[in-house]
Design a protein with these regions (language model features):
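Helical scaffold of the NTase/Pol beta-like nucleotidyltransferase catalytic core
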Residues: 1-39
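A short linear-motif detector with a strong N-terminal bias
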Residues: 16-18, 39-44, 81-84
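Active-site nucleotide-donor binding segment shared across nucleotidyl transfer reactions
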Residues: 24-60, 65-70
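Amphipathic alpha-helical segments
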Residues: 66-81
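Conserved catalytic core of two-metal-ion nucleotidyltransferases
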Residues: 77-119
Length: 125
């Protein structure tokens, strides 16, 4: 089971850490850890130190490089989180929780990748 978000307390909201660990675990189990999402957007900028640790994200942006994983998320997110809403768009899959939106984007740009606390991968801006 993937537990990096919870064990590192990446976010102050334990619910969010648990959601992300659950999603990453499902992907790692089905496709392997080399296929895990890459954190991007404002949260990646916080991880990189561009934004303050006090920055309050309005959503969590993740890049999924494989179209197969996009299809998997379209089908599995409603089963994993039945109380939440999932919206499928051509460029992304969005999980609307009661407290934040988690967006799974198709890749559009190639960026260098770094590792937050040597564990969670994110795009460098």
């Amino acid at each position: 089971m993937y537990t990096a978000f919870t064990s590192l307390n990446v976010f102050n909201d334990t619910r969010l850490n648990t959601y992300l660990d659950t999603i990453y675990s499902a992907i790692a189990t089905a496709f392997g850890e080399e296929q895990l999402p890459i954190v991007c957007g404002s949260v990646a900028k916080v991880m990189q130190g561009v934004y303050s640790d006090n920055y309050l994200a309005k959503d969590i942006d993740l890049v999924i490089e494989s179209w197969q994983i996009h299809r998997y998320l379209e089908q599995q997110l409603p089963l994993i989180f039945p109380a939440d809403r999932v919206e499928v768009r051509p460029e992304r899959v969005i999980l609307f929780t009661s407290f934040i939106a988690i967006e799974f984007w198709r890749p559009t740009l190639l960026r260098p990748i770094a590792y937050y606390k040597n564990t969670v991968n994110y795009y460098v801006y």
